Swiss-Prot record:
Protein name per UniProt: Protein YmaB
Top-level division of the source organism's lineage: Bacteria
InterPro entries reported in the protein's UniProt record: NUDIX_hydrolase-like_dom_sf (IPR015797)
Cystine crosslinks: none
Gene behind this protein: ymaB
Length: 206
């Protein structure tokens, strides 16, 4: 089965944004509105073949997008040419995560989200459990101004690590990572190389 034949979770755009009454551009972090959109996704999500979903802007694919923080630093990575998503090669990114799959027996969308998020982090990174302090929801990301963004909605969270914690990338031929201070991420030479979602995140990071 090819990557595009994978069954992933989607939700109709009309439901997610209540026929555009909840639409936003960029990062949205107002709790009540975020909760409302998440409830809309929970009520309407279903499975779809990934190849079809990628070409159909009538549906939004919810994507966990986890930023790894350590004090005033964020873990930044570059997608190398050996990686999968050709539309994002040589871009810098702060977010880990990916398409969500249905979880049999999950009690809620929150549980489906947590299990998919845990799996993605486990696949991509080596982080000691005792170094993890908390995972905090920061909001939602939407970017309807490019073809990739049109079919996705990001569920943004931050994984806080203890001072001195180490992060190891597992897929070294696909991504190269390093720690960087938030102030450095805001400088043009780095900021302009970030994928759009990561630029949105930097804009709200202190």
């Amino acid at each position: 089965m090819g990557k595009m034949d994978e069954m992933i979770l989607v939700a109709p755009r009309d439901d997610v944004f209540k026929k555009e009454s909840l639409t936003f551009q960029g990062v949205y972090s107002e709790d009540s509105r975020v909760a409302e959109i998440m409830a809309q996704i929970e009520a309407a999500y279903r499975e779809m073949r990934r190849g079809d979903a990628e070409e159909d802007p009538r549906f939004k694919q919810p994507i966990p997008y986890v930023v790894i923080k350590r004090e005033d630093e964020v873990f930044l990575y570059e997608r190398l040419a050996g990686g999968g998503e050709s539309r994002l090669h040589n871009k810098l990114s702060l977010g880990f995560g990916g398409h969500m799959n249905a979880i049999e027996g999950a009690a809620s969308f929150a549980e489906v989200l947590k299990l998919n998020t845990d799996r993605e982090l486990e696949e991509e990174l080596q982080i000691n459990e005792e170094d993890k302090q908390a995972i905090v929801t920061l909001g939602l990301i939407n970017d309807d101004e490019n073809s990739v963004g049109k079919v996705h909605i990001g569920i943004l969270s931050a994984l806080q690590l203890k001072p001195g914690a180490q992060v190891e990338v597992k897929e070294k031929e696909q991504i190269a990572g390093k720690w960087m201070k938030v102030s450095e991420l805001k400088q043009d030479d780095i900021y302009n190389r970030l994928e759009t979602w990561s630029q949105f995140v930097v804009d709200i990071l202190e």
